[in-house]
């Protein structure tokens, strides 16, 4: 909004020339999101408490979690507001990639909100059925995949980190691949959101990493020099990534151990979907497996646990997702959280290093 209102004035007032720079708008989208979280956060927490939107803790989980009973959830509403508003304020709203990503963020957010509302406000422990959630997740992701498939100039090739000449053409398989990336990322973040700050920390780190890749992918010279796919318009997504980083850090202010509020499905589903969409739009889908390694391991631990118990009658872990396994082994919750953050930072550095390893 500000880009369209103020940048045209640059011809008369040189000060407004800064609005053409992605770096400027990305930084201020981040700052705006962070300040918005600080200002609105306490009010959101109070409203959630007034709605009795309190987390129900599993009795079969670690005993240390029982003290979390009654902590407000659905705090992802704050995250969504702190992403969407700064993005609308600082981004170029003529950019179709911005709207595609916001579609997933808001769409998955609404889906998560309905599920959370049924569980914690209407006291329906089942919420939405897994089939219902999967149907809507896949439908929204399919919409993105179909749109991109028919978007003139958008490549349906798969690019691999470390290999500059290996990029197989997916053709029509690009659509189910997009669905796999977006839905998979959404559910992986959802599974990771089991400890205070465990999911939002890596999400912010992932968003910061993709901010860099969005900027490079949208710059013809930089992308050519670093030999990554050039995606015209992708650079504008750096503004949205900046808002995600700011919103993540702002929410972490309240979600750090011991948490004052949980994000709920409204936050985890939308954030994961956003990361998946960013990966697709920048042609860095495989990179998400690296920088989002914590999410991948969390999801795989559940898949392996369920598969092993179903076919072998034995569990691999004491409890899945894997962060609960470490809890039951006696590792303190804050230590697990910080270690997972450290791992994510290392993986982010590895992902960034692929820019020069091709």
From Swiss-Prot:
Q: Which GO terms describe its biological process?
A: cell division; cell wall organization; peptidoglycan biosynthetic process; regulation of cell shape
- Signal peptide position in this chain? none
Where does the sequence pass through the membrane?
24-44, 73-93, 95-115, 134-154, 169-189, 197-217, 233-253, 261-281, 286-306, 335-355
Catalytic activity, as annotated: UDP-N-acetyl-alpha-D-muramoyl-L-alanyl-gamma-D-glutamyl-meso-2,6-diaminopimeloyl-D-alanyl-D-alanine + di-trans,octa-cis-undecaprenyl phosphate = di-trans,octa-cis-undecaprenyl diphospho-N-acetyl-alpha-D-muramoyl-L-alanyl-D-glutamyl-meso-2,6-diaminopimeloyl-D-alanyl-D-alanine + UMP
Q: Which InterPro entries match?
A: Glycosyl_transferase_4, PNAcMuramoyl-5peptid_Trfase, PNAcMuramoyl-5peptid_Trfase_CS
Q: How does it sit in the membrane?
A: Multi-pass membrane protein
Superkingdom of the source species:
Bacteria
- Pfam families on file: Glycos_transf_4, MraY_sig1
Q: What is its EC number?
A: 2.7.8.13
The cofactor named in the record is: Mg(2+)
| Top-tier EC class | transferase
Keyword 4Fe-4S assigned: no
Chief location of this protein? membrane
Query: Which key words are in the record?
Result: Cell cycle, Cell division, Cell inner membrane, Cell membrane, Cell shape, Cell wall biogenesis/degradation, Magnesium, Membrane, Metal-binding, Peptidoglycan synthesis, Transferase, Transmembrane, Transmembrane helix
What subcellular locations does the record give? Answer: Cell inner membrane
Q: What does the record give under GO molecular function?
A: metal ion binding; phospho-N-acetylmuramoyl-pentapeptide-transferase activity; UDP-N-acetylmuramoyl-L-alanyl-D-glutamyl-meso-2,6-diaminopimelyl-D-alanyl-D-alanine:undecaprenyl-phosphate transferase activity
Q: What is one term from the GO cellular component aspect held by the record?
A: plasma membrane
**Pathway as given in its UniProt record:** Cell wall biogenesis; peptidoglycan biosynthesis
Tagged with keyword Cell membrane: yes
PANTHER family named among the record's database cross-references: PHOSPHO-N-ACETYLMURAMOYL-PENTAPEPTIDE-TRANSFERASE (PTHR22926), PHOSPHO-N-ACETYLMURAMOYL-PENTAPEPTIDE-TRANSFERASE HOMOLOG (PTHR22926:SF5)
Please describe what this protein does.
Catalyzes the initial step of the lipid cycle reactions in the biosynthesis of the cell wall peptidoglycan: transfers peptidoglycan precursor phospho-MurNAc-pentapeptide from UDP-MurNAc-pentapeptide onto the lipid carrier undecaprenyl phosphate, yielding undecaprenyl-pyrophosphoryl-MurNAc-pentapeptide, known as lipid I.
Homology family = Belongs to the glycosyltransferase 4 family. MraY subfamily.
| The protein, known as | Phospho-N-acetylmuramoyl-pentapeptide-transferase
Question: From which organism does this entry originate?
Answer: Citrifermentans bemidjiense (strain ATCC BAA-1014 / DSM 16622 / JCM 12645 / Bem)
